[in-house]
Amino acid sequence: MGGFSVGMLKDYVDIFVFAVLGVASFLALWFAIERVIFYSKVDLKAYDDIDALNLDLTKNLTILYVIFSNAPYVGLLGTVLGIMVIFYDMGVSGGMDAKTIMVGLSLALKATALGLAVAIPTLIAYNSLLRKSDVLSEKFRIMKK
């Protein structure tokens, strides 16, 4: 079995980055929908303790936070690896024309774009859900006075 090669990196970097970001976007959508459903059905009167309510209200928000915080870095990693492959190809071939380099660079940047495409909607969902959690918590405090 052979060791690491740039050809292997070239073949699998996009697959790896897109798979990680695809799973992250699926999880973000799943947990955001779960929270929306929970918030629409939560019965504040069923809780006696603010701490128990806050535990239930903030469940899965950390996962959304981790996804929006790390998705751009996963995309950036894909871009850096893609650029490394381009530089390697330039070195091996003894030079490339500007058109080939620009095409390679633009293709390498797609990983960063995808990372941002996952992070931005997840950030919006996270902040919206966190605000809803805060509002429900305050409604509980007012109700218990």
Curated annotation (Swiss-Prot):
Keyword terms, alphabetized: Cell inner membrane, Cell membrane, Membrane, Protein transport, Transmembrane, Transmembrane helix, Transport
TM segment ranges: 13-33, 67-87, 101-121
Membrane topology listed for this record: Multi-pass membrane protein
One GO-annotated biological process of the protein: transmembrane transport
Pfam families found in the cross-reference section: MotA_ExbB (PF01618)
Location of this chain's protein in the cell: Cell inner membrane
GO cellular component, one term: plasma membrane
InterPro entries registered for this protein in UniProt: ExbB/TolQ_transport, MotA_ExbB_proton_chnl, TonB_ExbB_2
NCBIfam families tied to this protein: exbB2 (TIGR02805)
Known role: Involved in the TonB-dependent energy-dependent transport of various receptor-bound substrates. Protects ExbD from proteolytic degradation and functionally stabilizes TonB.
Subunit record text: The accessory proteins ExbB and ExbD seem to form a complex with TonB.
Family affiliation: Belongs to the ExbB/TolQ family.
PANTHER family in alphabetical order: BIOPOLYMER TRANSPORT PROTEIN EXBB, PROTEIN TOLQ
Name of the protein described by the UniProt record: Biopolymer transport protein ExbB
